[in-house]
């Protein structure tokens, strides 16, 4: 039994981790505004490779045997797929959406990723969707519609390019969730994520080497460090440890702090003007995503009875 004080502490820390993810998008937006040489591609490459290296070094100190993982060919193929089809799009397309729009829009659009997971499981695994799942999905996509149009059928409030990158980022979020499901049961999530980031970063370097000179300004390196440390390394560690003390459904609900912090930050620091329909759309998406984690009380009791038998 986890002491209540410990559970409250890790619940608070998990909420702070979500805030960090949201705030990191603001640093990315600030970075892109400094110079056209600071592109989403460059930032993604730097973030993936440095963050991946740090996670692998940390996993080595924790005796999680990151090198030994590469001796299993199947594990390597899964991690490569996780990096290229999960970690790469969830970060690159997210940053591209931030560049052409803002951190708030990018974060909220990425929040519909779980609904693509739901659709995939319904089609491939014949998973029966609950009535709550269907209602939540309808609310989420209604929210995206309101956010994209301000509620006007003949008007797009955000550019089609921003919407395109945001939706691709959500698909990346779905792949990021689905691909490592089995491997993390056998291999440390830190090792899987670390190698996934390295493979994804190297693949981006092969596709588009970003070796041009970037502006040598203090704010460039400060913002880049913030994206890597505040947006990746610290929250990853917090979330990984929080799951030892807080139930996963609660941690998932705390993810709502990410779009909230990104939106508030965009309004305060980047002059984002939110129309009433924008707030309605944003709230619909976030609440709908949170609803997916709700389990009816009757179902919870059945699960508890099964575990006790």
Where are the predicted features?
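Helix-helix packing/entry segments at the starts of transmembrane helices
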Residues: 18, 46, 87, 91, ...
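Glycine-/small-residue-enriched transmembrane alpha-helix faces in small-molecule transporters
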Residues: 1-45, 155-182, 202, 304-309
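Transmembrane alpha-helices of multi-pass small-molecule transport proteins
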Residues: 36-88, 116-120, 172-179, 193-211, ...
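Juxtamembrane helix-entry segments on the extracytoplasmic side of multipass membrane proteins
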Residues: 6-11, 36-41, 45, 71-76, ...
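Specific transmembrane alpha-helical segments of multi-pass solute transporters/efflux pumps
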Residues: 62-104, 146, 228-246
């Amino acid at each position: 039994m986890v002491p209540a004080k410990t559970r409250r502490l890790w619940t608070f820390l998990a909420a702070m981790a979500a805030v960090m993810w949201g705030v990191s998008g603001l640093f990315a937006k600030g970075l892109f505004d400094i110079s056209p040489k600071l592109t989403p591609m460059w930032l993604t490459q730097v973030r993936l490779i440095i963050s991946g290296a740090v996670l692998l070094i940390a996993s080595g100190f924790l005796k999680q045997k990151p090198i030994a993982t590469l001796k299993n060919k199947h594990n390597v193929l899964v991690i490569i797929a996780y990096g290229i089809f999960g970690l790469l799009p969830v970060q690159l397309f997210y940053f591209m959406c931030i560049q052409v729009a803002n951190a708030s829009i990018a974060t909220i659009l990425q929040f519909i990723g779980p609904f693509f997971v739901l659709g995939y499981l319904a089609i491939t695994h014949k998973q029966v969707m609950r009535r709550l799942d269907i209602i939540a999905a309808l609310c989420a996509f209604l929210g995206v519609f309101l956010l994209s149009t301000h509620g006007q059928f003949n008007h797009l409030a955000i550019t089609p390019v921003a919407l395109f990158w945001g939706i691709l980022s959500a698909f990346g979020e779905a792949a990021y969730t689905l691909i490592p499901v089995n491997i993390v049961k056998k291999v440390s999530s830190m090792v899987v994520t670390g190698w996934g980031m390295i493979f994804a970063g190297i693949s981006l370097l092969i596709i588009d080497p970003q070796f041009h000179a970037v502006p040598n300004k203090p704010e460039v390196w400060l913002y880049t460090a913030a994206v890597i440390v505040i947006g990746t390394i610290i929250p990853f560690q917090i979330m990984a440890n929080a799951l030892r003390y807080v139930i996963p459904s609660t941690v998932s609900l705390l993810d709502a702090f990410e779009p909230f912090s990104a939106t508030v930050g965009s309004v305060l620091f980047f002059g984002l003007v939110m129309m009433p329909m924008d707030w309605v759309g944003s709230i619909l998406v976030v609440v709908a995503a949170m609803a997916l984690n709700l389990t009816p009380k009757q179902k919870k009791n059945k699960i508890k009875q099964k575990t006790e038998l």
